[in-house]
């Protein structure tokens, strides 16, 4: 397939613009480009065909099973999109006078109230644009709290090895030294390792519960108690909130602040269908540092994004919450856990889970022994799934499991879909022993086979050039 730039023909147009009825204004020379931008020139039909062809080469939740672990690729109800497309929401200007955006304000306030009830927090902001941005905002709350108290010796953030992947980077970006602690044999936080690193130099702990191997840490109250006794705060990464929403609240576990991925847990499209929203909630004592709730003094800057963040994502999330209601929210979490355990047990006769115990919303397969026996890697299995209409699971993560495949089926998949997926895994397991080369060269039917990822990382080509 050609790039859109390669289809460009000079002078070809697809836009019909009305005649200009205002006077021309000449921009100052210093504000003008020196040369025209390199934009493709196509007719409308060519443009339509190009993007139609592109969509036929991608795989989304609307196309088939998408068990991308730790990403919660659930189906996004169409009604959410319809609500976000209402003119009063889609056409609003962020600088409109307050009386003209009362409905938008009500959306933000109502969603904030519901999310505080679900998470056990007291304050909420929707400014962060995505999950990692929410993490960044949450850790800055912790930093500002300690700084405001003159407690500048707290320079470390504890991050377990089963935490979400962006946590160490977030802590480092906020200026903290990252202290990694290992998991115990059961996949949960090693309490003795935690106790060994706690001290008056610890600012806080970043934790996901359930963690990235899909296990709910039963020692969570003890973990947060230990951190608080050492003077630190506890940050909850909401990446896996889908497993427990409406059932248990992070605030009741002892967490002081949290970010949620509205674009995951609350069914607003992501993974190319975005944008996202990394809502951040906190306990009352941190509210003065929350971007939208603080009263700004002259020259002070307490924003992490312009206006109210990605507002239409909040509209979609509210539509989702209202559709499910108080009874439907915990039911969705229960079905997510049920589906994950069902699929894990169906697959277990072939590929083995890294932790042979009841999981939450996701589980991790460990293919290290399988690779030794067959020469087929986790990557080969993932690529082979593409030929069978299934999006690959998350590969080689978490790092504590060798040859890892992480699957999260979500609550919106039917039993029939899970049975079909389990059958595909069984077929691939047998194929690895009878024709491993077929798997090592997969995919065979995709538009792109196996790009050179090492070369792409070392010498990235990020834009088209003539």
Q: Across the structure, where does each feature detected by a protein language model lie?
A:
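Active-site lining segments that contact anionic ligands and/or coordinate catalytic metals
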Residues: 121, 154, 201-202, 229-233, ...
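A short, small-residue-rich loop immediately preceding and capping a beta-strand
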Residues: 122-128, 156-159
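Non-catalytic terminal extensions of PLP-dependent enzymes
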Residues: 1-123, 147, 248, 303-304, ...
């Amino acid at each position: 397939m050609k790039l859109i730039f390669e289809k460009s023909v000079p002078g070809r147009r697809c836009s019909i613009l009305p005649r200009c009825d205002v006077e021309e204004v000449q921009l100052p020379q210093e504000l003008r480009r020196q040369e025209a931008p390199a934009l493709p020139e196509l007719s409308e039909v060519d443009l339509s065909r190009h993007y139609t062809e592109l969509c036929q080469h991608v795989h989304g939740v609307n196309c088939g099973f998408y068990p991308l672990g730790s990403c919660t690729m659930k189906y996004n109800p169409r009604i959410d999109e319809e609500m976000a497309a209402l003119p009063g929401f889609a056409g609003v200007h962020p600088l409109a006078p307050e009386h003209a955006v009362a409905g938008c304000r009500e959306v933000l306030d109502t969603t904030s109230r519901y999310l505080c009830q679900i998470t056990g927090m007291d304050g909420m902001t929707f400014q962060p644009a995505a999950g990692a941005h929410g993490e960044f905002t949450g850790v800055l709350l912790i930093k500002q709290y300690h700084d405001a108290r003159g407690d500048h010796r707290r320079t470390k953030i504890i991050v377990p090895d089963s935490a979400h992947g962006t946590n160490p980077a977030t802590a480092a970006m906020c200026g903290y030294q990252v202290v990694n602690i290992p998991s115990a044999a059961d996949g949960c936080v090693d309490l003795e390792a935690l106790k060994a690193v706690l001290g008056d130099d610890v600012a806080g702990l970043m934790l996901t519960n359930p963690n990235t191997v899909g296990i709910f840490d039963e020692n969570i109250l003890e973990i947060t108690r230990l951190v608080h006794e050492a003077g630190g705060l506890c940050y909850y990464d909401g990446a896996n909130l889908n497993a427990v929403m409406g059932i248990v609240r992070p605030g009741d576990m002892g967490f002081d602040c949290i970010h949620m991925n509205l674009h995951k847990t609350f069914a607003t499209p992501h993974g190319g269908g975005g944008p996202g929203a990394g809502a951040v909630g906190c306990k009352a004592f941190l509210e003065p540092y929350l971007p939208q709730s603080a009263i700004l003094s002259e020259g002070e800057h307490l924003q992490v994004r312009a206006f109210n963040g990605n507002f239409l994502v909040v509209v979609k999330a509210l539509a989702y919450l209202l559709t499910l209601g108080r009874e439907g929210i915990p039911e969705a979490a229960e079905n997510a856990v049920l589906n994950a355990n069902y699929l894990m047990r169906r697959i277990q006769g072939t590929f083995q889970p890294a932790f042979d115990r009841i999981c939450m919303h996701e589980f991790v397969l460990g293919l290290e022994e399988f690779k030794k026996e067959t020469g087929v890697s986790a990557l080969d299995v993932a690529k082979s799934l593409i030929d069978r209409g299934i999006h690959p699971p998350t590969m080689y993560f978490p790092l504590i499991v060798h040859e890892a495949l992480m699957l999260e089926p979500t609550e919106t998949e039917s039993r029939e879909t899970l049975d079909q997926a389990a059958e595909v895994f069984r077929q691939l397991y047998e194929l690895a022993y009878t024709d491993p080369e077929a798997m090592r060269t997969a995919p065979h039917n995709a538009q792109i086979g196996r790009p050179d990822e090492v070369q792409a990382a070392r010498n990235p080509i990020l834009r088209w050039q003539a």
